Amino acid sequence: MSQTPSSLRDLEHHSAFVERHIGPNDAEIAQMLGVVGHDSLDAMTDAIVPSNIKSPAALALPDAITEEEALARIRAIASKNQVQRTFIGQGYYGTHTPKVILRNILENPAWYTAYTPYQAEISQGRMEALINFQTMCADLTGMQIANASLLDEATAAAEAMTLAKRSAKSKSDTFFVHDAVHPQTQELLRTRAEPLGIVLRVGTPDEAMQAECFGVLLQYPDSFGHIGDHAALADAVHAQGGLVAVATDLLALTLIAAPGEWGADIVVGNSQRFGVPFGFGGPHAAFMACRDAYKRSMPGRLIGVSIDAAGNPAYRLTLQTREQHIRREKATSNICTAQVLLAVMASMYAVYHGPEGLTRIARRTHRLAAILAAALRSAGVTVGEHFFDTLHVKAIDADAIHAKAHAAGINLRAIDSEAVGISLDETSTRADVVALAQLFGAQADIDALDAATADALPQGMRRTSAFLQHPVFNTHHSEHELLRYMRSLADKDLAMDRTMIPLGSCTMKLNATAEMIPVTWPEFGAIHPLAPPEQSAGYAQLIEELEAMLVECTGYDAVSLQPNSGAQGEYAGLLAIRAYHRSRNEAHRDICLIPESAHGTNPASAQMCGMTVVVTKCDANGNVDVDDIRAKAEKYSDRLAALMITYPSTHGVFEEDVVAICEAVHAHGGQVYTDGANMNALVGVAKPGKWGSDVSHLNLHKTFCIPHGGGGPGVGPCAVKSHLAPFLPKTLPNAGIRAGENQKAAIHGSGSNFGEGEVGMVSAASYGSASILPISWMYVTMMGSAGLRKATQVALLNANYIAKRLSAHYKTLYTGRNGLVAHECILDVRPLEKTSGIGAEDIAKRLIDFGFHAPTLSFPVAGTLMVEPTESESQHELDRFIDAMIQIREEIRAIEDGRLDREDNPLKHAPHTATQVSASEWTHAYPRELAAFPLPSLKQQKYWPPVGRVDNVYGDKNVMCACIPVDAYKDDVVA
């Protein structure tokens, strides 16, 4: 037992959270350092990190504070936000999050700590929830296939534009945009279109009838509430070889005709109003649905149905060859992180309410809107004729109405000096309708108006087709049924509430409960992204403080929090470089050098910026080839725009020549982009902005503790040096935090508010996924300067401890100086395939039998496993993983020695299900006990995968991306 502290400061224990976040205690750290061969964390760090990049001083951040102190501070910040009655709409609507979903999905680490479902066998639960999401979106839109979420509606619309460009027969470069598309979507389309040489034309649907274009984007219902009949326009666009994209509202589609029924080819939208709060703009799960003919050109992830080794239905990610991690610059999109957790919430909202419940919510919302419209008309106010939930109120003194509304604690949409918008939603009440009517001098006798008022849906556009007929949407309507359904899905999966997830380059670290708590506070969740700025003062403070924290951690000068994924942060950073060159009359600089070991998002993002990717080599030691970079920088000197590197490298080492690399690129006029995916090895130790890098994106869902959510949400801030700061993404003027404009400055119509040379928006909301920023603020605040440095050092220690303890069994492919790795290590298992027939995939599947998610498979080197343990894993958990890997090596040795068959062995048939090992007949040459319990400890705590090894080839040949018919399940399959 330690000596009793002698001072009150010691007893107050302000660094308590640091000890909770970091897995090994000081005694374990000392023991592990002994294994690695160093006597202190500082000595080990000096042996790993090149001296010319190490930070000379500690981070200029406050000391650590306790969870309770941090929660009190952020509560005070949140209290500065003003929650008022909001009817702004414009793509964001009030909704009730069912409490059973709030507690058991959003607040449940079994869901929010999971990783992207690349390993199908341990992801069946969340993939079922996602295939429900896909089915929901496809059904409601009337399309044949939908994906498993995109980042927001505006980026989804941009993806629709590029899908249309790839797929349309028309050779036109023009994309026509309905002038009543949401303003934030129009702005983002401008950002995306210009680097790709796409010409945007904005106008009315009538003008679109005559336009020569490869595609059209319509808003349905439109941004001002009108429900148009666009069937004739769809026919006209198709006749000239173009495609029709539609941005829509899922709740409205329960009442109005599905876009797929009147000619749409691609449908996008936001599922936010299915149970997800405003959150000052995000995160929310967008979607894309399309005709089956375009499925291989869709962006984002698709969940499909395949079969497992026993022939039973099993889910998997399908058609992955479309994606950036495989096709790189030829990918359909740079999207990686999406919005899985929010898609799961939206899908459960649909499961809970079912088609009848959703229709009831929609009818009630529409009824209130129709009653309000009738009340306003009775007072002589002009209101649009056909609508679902949004009224376009015209011919008024808008300033006077806004003044009265603000005095009453009501937010309306600013359109122009003579018009306002009013959007009702699930949370709207009779009292709201009365109060809204009074703003215009009208009286609303709700019952009388209800009896006398007809619906405002156009007769020819009412929905008659059925939707959500699968039993999953018609079964779980009691809370017990939904609770048990969600639990059954969670039990099928492996997340960090059960085990470490040792994925290299993914940084699956602790997502502390204290960090998560503020996310569900209404002071953060109930703020509309376009609310008047005085109502978001708390967000203003939070964002300013978090940006300052990130500037200090990185050594850059400015940060944008707008990108809502790491890939979007990359895109923003490359756009900044592009705009910088253009501001210097060097628009011809279009070459982006990218090492062959780079993350797939790097070349995909460069391509989206209109850059030409030139690949550079890696040397035999896994480092980027400095000579090749110098040669290509010189060869393309006049055209060199940028070099993208990852540091520490994707090979898991600190390269010695990073400063020289930066100097070589700068000498030829290029800029250096450092991918921040591996920032967990740098915080408090080294700052990319100080060694010559010009820009980085960060992954707050890696380094700064936002959970991965099974594949999103994420935040990918873009951090830059001062010369690039003018080219960070712009914000909507009425976001208020910096612009200082009041709400009537909101953009509308077809004009852009961005000046010449500025970079437009990269996300729909000015501050992206703002409502999860408190997580990272809490992490930095509770860790403090010393805690952040220690976290980095322990991340380095844990990786080196694994590499050292496994060195007698597996070769670590690359090491840096002194034989050490960075925060991750690559285990080279390729020689084992030659001696035993066992490859990296077999080892990954066998780890499931030990209760582990696999390391990263075949990246950045094919046939290898990349392991990143993070600082949050205890020595006990590291040893458990090491023991599993050693046992697997012994099984491989048994194959090499002939004691196990090369084909009929536990690795080739892994993972093993409970159904399989308990069957009356066992046909394998190895015993059941070896299959199920390869280590004695597994008899105390065992994870059983719900399916056997999933057949990837079958899944890609037989693409099915909707809910499985009930009769497809065999009687003997365990639910």
UniProtKB/Swiss-Prot annotation:
GO cellular component, as recorded: cytosol; glycine cleavage complex
Originating organism:
Xanthomonas campestris pv. campestris (strain 8004)
GO BP terms, alphabetized: glycine decarboxylation via glycine cleavage system
Q: What is its EC number?
A: 1.4.4.2
Catalysed reaction per UniProt?
N(6)-[(R)-lipoyl]-L-lysyl-[glycine-cleavage complex H protein] + glycine + H(+) = N(6)-[(R)-S(8)-aminomethyldihydrolipoyl]-L-lysyl-[glycine-cleavage complex H protein] + CO2
The cross-references to Pfam families, in alphabetical order and at most eight, read:
GcvP2_C, GDC-P
What InterPro entries does the database record attribute to this sequence?
Answer: GcvP (IPR003437), GDC-P_C (IPR049316), GDC-P_N (IPR049315), GDC_P (IPR020581), PyrdxlP-dep_Trfase (IPR015424), PyrdxlP-dep_Trfase_major (IPR015421), PyrdxlP-dep_Trfase_small (IPR015422)
Which class of enzymes does this protein belong to? oxidoreductase
Q: Which SUPFAM superfamilies match?
A: PLP-dependent transferases
Instruction: Provide the function of this protein.
Output: The glycine cleavage system catalyzes the degradation of glycine. The P protein binds the alpha-amino group of glycine through its pyridoxal phosphate cofactor; CO(2) is released and the remaining methylamine moiety is then transferred to the lipoamide cofactor of the H protein.
Gene Ontology molecular functions:
glycine binding; glycine dehydrogenase (decarboxylating) activity; pyridoxal phosphate binding
Q: Does the keyword Oxidoreductase apply?
A: yes
Cross-referenced PANTHER family: GLYCINE DEHYDROGENASE (DECARBOXYLATING), MITOCHONDRIAL (PTHR11773:SF1), GLYCINE DEHYDROGENASE, DECARBOXYLATING (PTHR11773)
How this chain assembles, per its entry, is: The glycine cleavage system is composed of four proteins: P, T, L and H.
Q: Which cofactor does it need?
A: pyridoxal 5'-phosphate
Where is the chain membrane-spanning?
Answer: none
For this UniProt record, the keywords arranged alphabetically read as follows: Oxidoreductase, Pyridoxal phosphate
Q: Which gene encodes it?
A: gcvP
In the UniProt record, does the keyword Oxidoreductase occur?
A: yes
Task: Identify this protein by name.
Answer: Glycine dehydrogenase (decarboxylating)
Residues recorded as bearing N6-(pyridoxal phosphate)lysine in the entry:
K702
Q: What is the annotated signal peptide range for this record?
A: none
- UniProt family annotation: Belongs to the GcvP family.
